[in-house]
Amino acid sequence: ALTSMTSQMREGTIRKCDMASIYTYQNTLYKLQMNGWQLRQFMEWSAAFFKTWEPGDVTIAFDSSVRYYLYDAFAGVKYDLDISKQPGNRIQNLTWMDGRPVEDDDSFVVAVNNYRATTQLLTYADIFKEGDELPKLLEIDVRGDVGGIRELLGEYIRTVKGGTIEPHVDNNWKLVGDNWNTADHEKAVKLLREGKLALSENADSRTLPGKAITTADIAAF
């Protein structure tokens, strides 16, 4: 989950304050076991962060009731997130990294922070309801001898990456269903960059724009 909308990891020396900037909370790491059905429910809950694409939209928009730190992207599997579909039906083509379809009874070990584990995955809340089988807790405070997630990030950079990291994108997932005209989308992006259009702002700074730019918005330009 993204914990800050303003943090950046700039080229150069990485300092402890950089870890605190990109990960603002004192979370620890939990290790859970879940089956394919549970994983899909988790992913569908996260995918509700996006508003459903509607004809005429030329940018994506976000559910303004969902704070950005409640959105999780997933590694270790491949999937499409279809924003033309309603929440609960958006995760498409979910496979293992080798292309095998994920089945409901497949077993996964999933790393999440303690907040997500205790508020959503190990209790009945938004994702799982009474009667559902909950994921199994395998370990709390993983590598607690090192510290929390901030410290684990630093440890990973030092010991696994040899002290140097470079930008890398897995490309294991993508947004689909944004069926806009490419020229209209590019025009909207140009107008936004020129300051001739602006994205909507929400009262809660922890949420993202809840209104898409539309063909009607760009028609006057």
Language model segments and positions:
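Catalytic centers of hydrolytic enzymes
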Residues: 1-195
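Extracytoplasmic Gram-positive cell-surface binding/anchoring modules and repeats
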Residues: 186, 190-221
